[in-house]
């Protein structure tokens, strides 16, 4: 009975997930659960499998073996596209905005085309989210006229406009000039107060300390350690975690 109660609160579950690209095994038996509403931050060195992990979680990549469940539903070759549309939004490193569409058109394209939301309703919601990220005045300009920080804030507004229960962030500040990083982090910190589930790959340790319910450390395709920010940053258990933090927290 207790196990069934716990399962009811899980949004994402990975069981023994492996992912290979040719002969290269990037994920090596990942087990991970994410409860509804959790703010999960994934950290680790470059090449550790972090980005591949979240792309397998949301169905952008098909796992080589193992199982991925979204809200209790097994993700398969046939179901993963539909589950991705229904449950997941993604904020990428490189913004991935359509340069030939206005900001408003970028935000409303997927809700109208994929979710069949009436255009007027989608535009009203998009404007709400543009106001939230402080860019309502940019609704009818093209992305190429905006700074990198503004484009990433637009990408966050786009993810909110889908109204999906989980938002994935794949190193959302890594392509930004240093002076633009904080404006994006501030939006993400504000968003963390919502009920939405957030899965964030980042090198921003201050953000992880402030926002995460749990921090996961990946290395070599494995999850080596996980815990609350307080425990993870002040009393890590694994020697590899200690070595990583000693370099990145200098």
Where are these regions (language model features)?
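ABC family nucleotide-binding domain
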Residues: 11-229
């Amino acid at each position: 009975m207790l196990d069934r109660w716990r399962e009811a609160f899980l949004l994402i579950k990975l069981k023994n997930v492996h992912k290979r690209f040719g002969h290269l095994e990037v994920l090596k038996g990942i087990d991970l659960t994410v409860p509804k509403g959790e703010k999960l931050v994934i950290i680790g060195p470059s090449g550790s499998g972090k980005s591949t992990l979240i792309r397998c979680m949301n169905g952008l990549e098909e796992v080589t073996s193992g199982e991925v469940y979204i809200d209790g539903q097994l993700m398969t070759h046939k179901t993963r596209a539909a589950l991705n549309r229904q449950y997941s939004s993604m904020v990428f490193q490189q913004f991935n905005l359509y340069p030939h569409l206005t900001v408003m058109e970028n935000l409303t394209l997927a809700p109208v085309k994929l979710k069949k939301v009436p255009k007027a309703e989608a535009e009203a919601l998009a404007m709400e989210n543009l106001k939230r990220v402080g860019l309502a005045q940019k609704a009818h300009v093209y992305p190429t006229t905006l700074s990198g920080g503004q484009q990433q804030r637009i990408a966050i507004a786009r993810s909110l406009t889908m109204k999906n229960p989980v938002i994935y962030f794949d190193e959302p500040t890594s392509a930004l000039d240093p002076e633009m990083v904080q404006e994006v982090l501030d939006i993400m910190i504000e968003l963390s107060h919502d009920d939405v589930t957030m899965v964030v790959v980042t090198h921003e340790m201050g953000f992880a300390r402030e926002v995460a319910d749990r921090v996961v450390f990946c290395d070599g395709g494995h999850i080596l350690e996980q815990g609350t920010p307080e425990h993870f940053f002040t009393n890590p258990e694994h020697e590899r975690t200690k070595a990583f933090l000693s370099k990145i927290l200098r």
